[in-house]
Amino acid sequence: MSEQSKCPVTGRTAGNPVAGGSMLNRDWWPNQLHLDMLHQHSSLVNPMGDEFRYKEEFRKLDLGAVKKDLYALMTDSQEWWPADYGHYGGLFIRMAWHSAGTYRTSDGRGGGGRGNQRFAPLNSWPDNANLDKARRLLWPIKQKYGKMLSWADLMILAGNCALESMGFKTFGFGGGRVDIWEPEEDIYWGKEVEWLGNNRYSGERDLENPLAAVQMGLIYVNPEGPDGNPDPVAAGRDIRETFARMAMNDEETVALVAGGHTFGKCHGVGDPNLIGPEPEAAGIEEQGLGWKSGYGSGKGDETMTSGLEGAWTPDPIHWDMGYLGMLFKYEWELTKSPAGAWQWKPKDVAEEDLAPAAHDPSKRVPTMMTTADLAMRMDPVYGPISRRYYEHPDQFADAFARAWFKLTHRDMGPKSRYLGAEVPAEDLIWQDPVPAVDHELIGEGEIAELKKRLLASGLPIPELVSTTWASASTFRGSDKRGGANGSRIRLAPQKDWEVNQPEQLQRVLEKLEEIRHAFNGEQSGGKRVSLADLIVLGGCAAVEEAARRAGNDVTIPFAPGRTDASQAETDVESFAVLEPLADGFRNYARQKYSVTPEEMLVDRSQLLTLTATEMTVLLGGLRVLGANFRQSPHGVFTKRHETLTNDFFVNLLDMGTEWKPVSKEHDTFEGRDRKTGEPRWSATRVDLIFGSNARLRAIAEVYGSDDAQEKFVQDFVAAWNKVMNLDRFEIS
């Protein structure tokens, strides 16, 4: 082969791709622990730089001007992708819905809060076909407002403006979504290796957790019915399961489906085999666009998207009762679209109930319903709700407005994070409200005094530390839920979670409440301490005392201002999903799972927004502080208990210890003296992974060195303080 045909850098020939042509570590060792998810979205991939603050930029934005531009865009049909019915509303509603609709409650991941629809795999999901065009239509507006308006906010705002421009009154809009700049590596979308694959069910039809869609590449359900079977009642069961996993109840589900399908149409007029590859697989000349269709012009009335064909209502660009009216007015018979997809047509449809052709208003064409739509009538629960909405249009409009707002804001966390003039004043239970501070906050003198009282209370260091960790570590960076603010650890359901050791927790909380009551009663002015603040302060005092015992004087920064939520402000069912299935930091697992304990530790660390270094130093410190579930000895590699030493790392790395499994599942281990055979320590996989995994061992070696004690304490305190304040959005 000639030298000209070889890459001058790598030596690869033209037949081998320069990028991705060699085996990666994960190709050689597919079971390797996936730590990269802990280092996503760093400043190295963010073109905005470390000093950029989106909140400050958004506050400069003229939101009214942006909305005016969006309203104008709705009817500014472009030749390269003409608007159905002369209005892009339906397209932008679908784009916003599919941006937000990937959210799932089980781990809080997905949703529209990061603008992730711009990246793989979402930008190439079959269910997102042709939404690339919607984003390209928005580019002139994004270009105009630049850094003041994120893609994430723009996509949701475009959906709102689409609804408003077609006559619907929305509930409001909150900005503040910060864009990411690379695909998310932490989200498990399923194990299937083909689009629309379905290997996620077991039993009769038990959907794998944490998934919230029935097939790979769909947002929720197959609109043709379960696995393409056009059974509306069976479709209702799938809809209920998937929407519930997105935090929607039955009434919200009906409102969303009926409200959203009041607008726009489906596209399936020709042979689906003529649709080209998705954006990530398309040629470079397509410039990031995909699904180029070879059917006719590939646009306008010859557009191919889902394979279904037709509008739901006779007037697809105005808010009315057309969807529910058609649903109940007619009987429906099964048919197939021109593309071969199962759908339903109304029997003996009246002339006035035909829809205009999307690009020729002189023509009238039949409307349609999908199998999923008919579930809104045929399902025994959805049916009566749909009928009530049909008979009470005001209830329907209010329910849809609220459900749409919830859909598009559910992953943003508490209302305090919302920005802009259109944030609704009403507090909603799903926003996990906490009361505003209504008292003077404690200062440095009171903080020092309270620490003394906490340490003199008789509560041991392990109980103070584990209670504080239990309160703060519920936080999820995915949907900004959980955390210590609100002191919900004293409320149902958290007070009863096994991992929180309810009997010990009750004892600790009673003592903390006693201290709080006495302190507040002594104050002559309006100064008070909340239980939420005192819970965190107790753990901080315990960590500082443990560090002093190790010879290190440290003061953990403490910012008061947390308040105490009530049980009425706490949705028990909604908070139940925050219960840890496993918490490696406390060496806890509720049961054995198909994934390894160390994988669950990394997953939990990612939700806590920890780096691998922070995860490592926190776990090593919590072990010697005695924070294990039920005081388990596993991983407590120290003889100096309740002392913040680097002993965990020193003893983990000691080659004088030989480890062997003591359970057939290889999840618990015993470490014996390599020479004498005497037992030294016991451990779980979560403990030993820090000596086994090469990357984690490298970090452990830093903290296990002879000169590492001071650095270990400093790094532990920094990571601890980070977790304590993850939900303090007002100070972050």
Swiss-Prot record:
Entry GO CC: cytosol
Q: Where is this cross-link: Tryptophyl-tyrosyl-methioninium (Tyr-Met) (with W-97)?
A: 220-246
Q: Where is this site: Transition state stabilizer?
A: 94
Q: Which cofactor does it need?
A: heme b
Q: Please give the biological process terms from Gene Ontology that the record holds.
A: cellular response to hydrogen peroxide; hydrogen peroxide catabolic process
What lineage is this protein's organism placed in? Bacteria, Pseudomonadati, Chlorobiota, Chlorobiia, Chlorobiales
Family annotation (PANTHER family): CATALASE-PEROXIDASE, HYDROPEROXIDASE I, BIFUNCTIONAL CATALASE-PEROXIDASE
Q: What is its EC number?
A: 1.11.1.21
Pfam families, per the entry: peroxidase (PF00141)
Q: Which UniProt keywords apply?
A: Heme, Hydrogen peroxide, Iron, Metal-binding, Oxidoreductase, Peroxidase
Q: Post-translation: what modifications?
A: Formation of the three residue Trp-Tyr-Met cross-link is important for the catalase, but not the peroxidase activity of the enzyme.
Q: Which organism is it from?
A: Chlorobium phaeobacteroides (strain DSM 266 / SMG 266 / 2430)
| Family, as annotated | Belongs to the peroxidase family. Peroxidase/catalase subfamily.
Protein residues bound to heme b = 261
Quaternary structure, from the entry: Homodimer or homotetramer.
According to UniProt, the reaction catalysed is: H2O2 + AH2 = A + 2 H2O; 2 H2O2 = O2 + 2 H2O
The protein depicted here goes by the name: Catalase-peroxidase
- Swiss-Prot/TrEMBL puts the cross-link Tryptophyl-tyrosyl-methioninium (Trp-Tyr) (with M-246) at 97-220
- What is this protein for, i.e. what is its function? Bifunctional enzyme with both catalase and broad-spectrum peroxidase activity.
Q: Is Heme among this UniProt entry's keywords?
A: yes
